[in-house]
Design a protein with these regions (language model features):
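C-terminal and inter-domain tail/linker signature
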Residues: 1-146
C-alpha cells in the first residue's frame, strides 16, 4: 500500500474519466447505489474484482451490498487512469476492514487490501461493460496473515 492515490483536486477530467472517478469515489466509497443508473446502461455487464459476473442494476446493487458488508469502511484509491477511445482503464487499491467470511477465511477485523485493474467500456456517456481483474490471491494472503 505504498503507492499514493492520484490527487484529483482541481483536475479537470474527461467525461469518461470523471464517470470512473464518480463510480469509485462517490458510488463505492459511500455505497451510494442511487448513482448506478447515472453511470451504467440498464443491462450493463460487470465482472467484479472478487470474481462474480453480473448483469444489470439489481445484481450489481447486490454486489455493492455484499462487498461493503464484507469490508467495513470500504474505500478505493485511484492510483492511475488511462483513456483510449471509448475505454478507461486504471490501477486501483481496494481496502477495508475484514468483517465477514470471504473465500473461506473467517473475519479478522483487520484492515486488508487488494489491487484491481478495471476496464470500463463506454457506449455514449454511460458504461456498457466493466471488467475488473483483482488480486484475489494477494487479498486471501493478507486476510490469512491478519
Amino acid at each position: 500500500m505504498d503507492e499514493p492515490a492520484l490527487d484529483l483536486t482541481g483536475v479537470t477530467l474527461s467525461p469518461q474519466k470523471e464517470m470512473v472517478r464518480v463510480f469509485y469515489k462517490l458510488l463505492w466509497d459511500h455505497a451510494d447505489k442511487s448513482l448506478i443508473p447515472t453511470i451504467f446502461h440498464p443491462d450493463f455487464s460487470f465482472r467484479g474484482s472478487l470474481g462474480p459476473t453480473l448483469v444489470g442494476y439489481r445484481q450489481f446493487g447486490g454486489y455493492v451490498d455484499w462487498v461493503t458488508g464484507t469490508f467495513g469502511q470500504y474505500t478505493t484509491d485511484i492510483l492511475a487512469m488511462i483513456e483510449e477511445g471509448n475505454c478507461v482503464s486504471g490501477k486501483m487499491l481496494f481496502h477495508g476492514f475484514h468483517r465477514e467470511e470471504l473465500f473461506g477465511v473467517l473475519p479478522s477485523g483487520r484492515h486488508v487490501w487488494w489491487t484491481g485493474m478495471p476496464i470500463f467500456t463506454f457506449e455514449g456517456p454511460k458504461v456498457r461493460d466493466l471488467f475488473v481483474l483483482g488480486d484475489i490471491h494477494g487479498l486471501i494472503g493478507r486476510m490469512r496473515d491478519a
